[in-house]
Amino acid sequence: INAGLVGSEMCIRDSPRGQIGNNLDVDLHMLTVRAKTIRDLAHCVKRCDLELAGVASAAYVSGRSTLVEDEQELGAVCIDLGGGSTSYSIFLKKHMIFAGSIMLGGNHVTRDISLGLQVPMVVAEKIKTKNGGLIATGIDDRDLIEIGGETGDWEHDRRTVTRSELIGIMRPRIEEILEDVRTQLEIAGFY
């Protein structure tokens, strides 16, 4: 929250505490969530004999836990690639000033690998986690990844792909996700 006290001849933009003025201007970013969602979550936690200490936005928590203090102060975007969605937050002067999300995430990358290599989703997730990357180097053309499938066809199940081929499957989806985040930031006036 940024607040400013506007008086007849002065404008205080740091903190209006203890000041006197005619108007109080407030610039804030508000995140909303359905009350039922919070109640359901709190009920689940309570049924596990735990207490809910509080509720916080995942975008806020990700930014606070991954950005160093200087980044939060000078300004940075934190992008959190989740399974089914990607959240992003902007920090400036140690405050989150914007947050949002798009409905693309790591599961979409896994699905692309599954389709591209013709392997089950479980196998694709293991391949992504163990061998995934986004920038191909010269050694990646020679780095072979053994693909295990479950079709019953020995030739099909026991084959290899290069790490470069895997990167070629993953990179377009990640680029799409980052472009979508960039578009949302442009729409919000931050790019």
Language model features: what each stretch is:
Residues 56-64:
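Short acidic loop-to-helix transition motifs that present clustered carboxylates
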Residues 25-35, 50-51:
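Flexible, glycine/proline-enriched loop segments at strand-loop-helix junctions
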Residues 43-54:
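A short, contiguous, amphipathic alpha-helix enriched in charged residues
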Residues 30, 35-43, 60, 91-179, ...:
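Phosphate-binding glycine-rich/basic clefts of nucleotide- and phosphate-handling proteins
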Residues 9, 67-98, 113:
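Gly/Thr-rich phosphate-binding beta-strand-loop-beta motif of the actin/hexokinase/Hsp70
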Residues 1-12:
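Single conserved hydrophobic/aromatic residue that forms the stacking wall/gate
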Residues 13-24:
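Residues forming anionic-ligand binding surfaces in small-molecule and nucleic-acid pockets
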